[in-house]
């Protein structure tokens, strides 16, 4: 197996694991979410105890499903958590939809929908005010898009620009790969079109996208989830 995986190679590994019965999609998503929290606490030990506040950005696919697992697990640990959902939950993949429902059932008042595919300026302003306005957010998690993204995120520009404008107000964590970073590098020329990660938590092996976008990834931690 190569030391660095492409998106298609990683998906093939996951499919083989599912087909063999070694793990289900829900189990793998739970492991991924827990591994992000483990990496976060390893990287920022002061966050492992006490009360903290996280904002989770969840996208329309399985990366978003990982985000809902992270939200739920942090909430159970006593964190204040708010989720911004950039998706129609009814169109999410089955396992991601199941984790969306688990989160909403647990904390129905802590999820904010934002327009998909194009975020409205007023929504981005509200996101900025709620996420950064009081200066108390500790962690912003990017669970919008994972590996294999091949199109610019023009509809998300207002959110990405807000994150960059508040770059030093929180610890920014990307799940698998910073959103806006494709396999061959950034999908757009502007630096602010890629989520500004301090920590990127990826699974099983480093990915080609990381190698072609190291300056956007911050610290890269590889977590093993049983594939």
UniProtKB/Swiss-Prot annotation:
Its cofactor is K(+). The keyword Phosphoprotein does not apply. (6S)-NADPHX binds at residues 62-66, 146-152, 176. K(+) binds at residues 63, 142, 179. Residues 10-227 form the YjeF N-terminal domain. Gene3D superfamilies: YjeF N-terminal domain. GO terms for molecular function: metal ion binding; NAD(P)HX epimerase activity; nucleotide binding. It comes from the Bacteria. Its EC number is 5.1.99.6. Binds 1 potassium ion per subunit. It catalyses: (6R)-NADHX = (6S)-NADHX; (6R)-NADPHX = (6S)-NADPHX. Pfam families: YjeF_N. Keywords: Isomerase, Metal-binding, NAD, NADP, Nucleotide-binding, Potassium. Belongs to the NnrE/AIBP family. Catalyzes the epimerization of the S- and R-forms of NAD(P)HX, a damaged form of NAD(P)H that is a result of enzymatic or heat-dependent hydration. This is a prerequisite for the S-specific NAD(P)H-hydrate dehydratase to allow the repair of both epimers of NAD(P)HX. This is NAD(P)H-hydrate epimerase. The lineage of its organism: Bacteria, Pseudomonadati, Pseudomonadota, Alphaproteobacteria, Rhodobacterales.
């Amino acid at each position: 197996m190569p030391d660095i995986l492409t998106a298609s190679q990683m998906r093939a590994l996951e499919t083989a694991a599912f087909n063999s019965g070694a793990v289900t999609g829900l189990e793998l998503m739970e492991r991924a979410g827990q591994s992000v929290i483990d990496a976060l606490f390893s990287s920022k030990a002061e966050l492992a105890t006490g009360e903290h506040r996280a904002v989770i950005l969840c996208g329309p696919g399985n990366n978003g499903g990982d985000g809902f697992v992270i939200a739920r697990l942090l909430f159970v640990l006593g964190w204040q958590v708010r989720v911004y959902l950039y998706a129609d939950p009814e169109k999410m993949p089955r396992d991601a939809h199941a984790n969306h429902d688990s989160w909403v059932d647990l904390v129905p008042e802590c999820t904010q929908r934002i327009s998909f595919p194009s975020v409205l300026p007023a929504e981005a302003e509200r996101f900025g005010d709620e996420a950064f306005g009081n200066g108390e957010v500790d962690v912003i998690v990017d669970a919008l898009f994972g590996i294999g993204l091949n199109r610019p995120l023009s509809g998300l520009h207002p959110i990405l620009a807000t994150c960059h404008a508040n770059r030093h107000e929180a610890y920014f964590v990307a799940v698998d790969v910073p959103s806006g970073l494709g396999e061959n590098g950034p999908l757009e020329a502007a630096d602010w079109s890629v989520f500004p990660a301090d920590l990127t938590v990826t699974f099983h092996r480093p990915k080609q996208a990381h190698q072609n976008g190291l300056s956007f990834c911050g610290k890269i931690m590889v977590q093993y989830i049983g594939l």
